[in-house]
């Protein structure tokens, strides 16, 4: 199915390119080297990079992408991208990072492929990453239909906008799990992905004050889980009915494992989105909250105020301080310490011990070793014993980011975070672990060498959660227009 999707994307690119009246093609080439010490690449070098930067220190990569952008002023338009990475000391020496085709009709989009996803709502340069989806893991191939941008709702006189969509996809980490699991650890293959969201924006374009409210949900379902000997232990159904059951969601049928019959089919998680903002011509400030839930107890706020709290400011003009973001990620309540599903022997339901991102059968909300959501719920790739699941999800982090222009052509970005970790409800740490991480990046461009970007960055970690790490990062990139054809 994954190869068929790639073939479909390449076919669509060739067909639409050959018949296009107007066609533009841009490129981006990048080289990046990291040198340092410690067991891992510093936290803010590796995380939120789409899985491109290796977790191993003293690593690097070469990257080449070809992209066509959408024409926003046309009723029908399309975009596509092909992005290849060659890596040193990463989990694969060469791989396709992005391959997608996106057709736009008015405000609607039909998308197929794998494309890096950053936070839908918050500052994409400075946010630490959403609780549900961030740019922390490698992209998941999927097919999507929806409204990717806020669109005016008819008959609301310019006061109500909506965005949202539905997608189904495939996890592509079967080989990764088999290679990196330790003996005695279970793994899964052919897992499926589902996501749906709807978000409303309340506020008139002519007024500065606005509010945002919505829900974003995702599901891991289907596939097969194997024990350490490679024996099939759980086979999840993945027929048409299962696609409908994860959309609603509903409990699994008789052919589903007992856990899916007692609860709902698949591993469900999501966020409620709330924000209040104030926007002027050249700046925007907003306060926001993502309430995270991993089951129905979280949906009814039994996990209190777990989630991501943030305050961000963004200025559009060049200035020494153009963007500032402060965030607090809290995942310490989890509805209480333990879970008990009602049974004939003990007819009591205790909906607690939410065990964020984890699952009773699946390894959890992880793709190729990286947490799909916030990096503060420690990614399984940090597990030195080959365990593919989460070992630290009871955690709290304080985070800050700032960026701006020092002089023409010279920009900076500073990220700082401090995190405490308690382990999990089922395997708590003996002592609370701490981690401080920071990064400072300088990037330089000059009008005489158009399209070139040179960057230098330093970062370090201090603590006992992922250890003491430090490194310098050197980067160079070149982007520009490759083709611009106007056919008559």
Give the location of each predicted region:
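Outer-membrane pore/translocation modules
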Residues: 24-50, 107, 122-129, 134-136, ...
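Transmembrane beta-strands of outer-membrane beta-barrel pores
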Residues: 31-39, 70, 84-88, 105-107, ...
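Short loop/turn motifs that connect adjacent beta-strands in outer-membrane beta-barrel proteins
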Residues: 21-26, 68-79, 104-107, 150-164, ...
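Transmembrane beta-strand segments of Gram-negative outer membrane beta-barrel proteins
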Residues: 20-62, 72-82, 164-168, 454
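Internal, well-ordered domain-core segments that constitute the primary functional module
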Residues: 118-228
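Outer-membrane beta-barrel pore domains
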Residues: 259-272, 277-488
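Bacterial Sec-dependent N-terminal signal peptides
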Residues: 1-24, 477-482, 488
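Surface-exposed loop and membrane-interface regions of Gram-negative outer-membrane beta-barrel proteins
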Residues: 18, 74-105, 117-136
């Amino acid at each position: 199915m994954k190869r068929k999707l790639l073939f479909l994307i390449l076919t669509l690119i060739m067909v639409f390119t050959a018949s296009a009246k107007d066609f533009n093609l841009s490129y981006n080439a990048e080289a990046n080297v990291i040198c340092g010490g410690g067991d891992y690449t510093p936290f803010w070098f590796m995380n939120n990079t789409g899985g491109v930067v290796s977790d191993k220190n003293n690593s690097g990569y070469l990257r080449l992408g070809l992209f066509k952008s959408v024409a926003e002023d046309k009723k029908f338009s399309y975009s596509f991208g092909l992005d290849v990475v060659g890596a040193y000391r990463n989990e694969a020496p060469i791989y396709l990072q992005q391959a997608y085709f996106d057709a736009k009709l008015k405000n609607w989009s039909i998308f197929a492929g794998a494309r890096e996803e950053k936070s839908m709502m918050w500052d994409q340069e400075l946010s630490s990453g959403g609780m549900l989806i961030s740019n922390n893991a490698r992209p998941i191939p999927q097919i999507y239909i929806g409204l990717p941008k806020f669109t005016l709702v008819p008959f609301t006189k310019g006061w109500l906008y909506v965005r949202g969509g539905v997608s189904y996809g495939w996890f592509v980490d079967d080989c990764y799990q088999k290679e990196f699991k330790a003996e005695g650890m279970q793994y899964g293959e052919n897992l499926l992905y589902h996501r749906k969201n709807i978000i409303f924006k309340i506020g008139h374009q002519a007024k500065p004050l606005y509010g945002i409210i919505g829900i974003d949900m995702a599901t891991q379902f289907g596939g097969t889980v194997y024990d350490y000997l490679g024996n099939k232990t759980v086979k999840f159904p993945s027929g048409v009915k299962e696609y409908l059951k994860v959309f609603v969601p509903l409990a699994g049928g008789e052919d589903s494992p007992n856990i899916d019959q007692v609860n709902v089919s698949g591993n469900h998680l999501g966020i409620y989105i709330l924000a209040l903002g104030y926007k002027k011509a050249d700046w925007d400030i907003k306060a926001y909250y993502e309430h995270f839930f991993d089951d129905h107890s979280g949906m009814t706020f039994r996990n209190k105020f777990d989630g991501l709290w943030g305050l961000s400011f963004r200025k559009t003009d060049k200035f020494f301080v153009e963007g500032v973001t402060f965030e607090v990620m809290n995942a310490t309540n989890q509805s209480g310490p333990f879970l008990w599903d009602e049974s004939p022997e003990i007819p009591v339901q205790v909906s607690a011990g939410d065990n964020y991102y984890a699952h009773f059968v699946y390894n959890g909300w992880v793709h190729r070793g990286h947490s799909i959501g916030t990096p503060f719920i420690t990614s399984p790739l940090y597990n030195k014993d080959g365990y593919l699941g989460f070992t630290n999800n009871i955690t709290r982090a304080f985070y800050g980011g700032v960026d701006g222009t020092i002089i023409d052509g010279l920009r900076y970005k500073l990220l700082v975070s401090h995190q405490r970790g308690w382990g999990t409800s089922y395997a708590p740490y003996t002592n609370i672990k701490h981690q401080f991480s920071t990064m400072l990046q300088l990037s330089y461009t000059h009008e005489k060498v158009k399209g070139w970007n040179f960057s230098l960055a330093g970062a370090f970690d201090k603590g006992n959660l992922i250890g003491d790490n430090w490194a310098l990062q050197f980067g160079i990139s070149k982007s520009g227009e490759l083709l611009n054809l106007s056919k008559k």
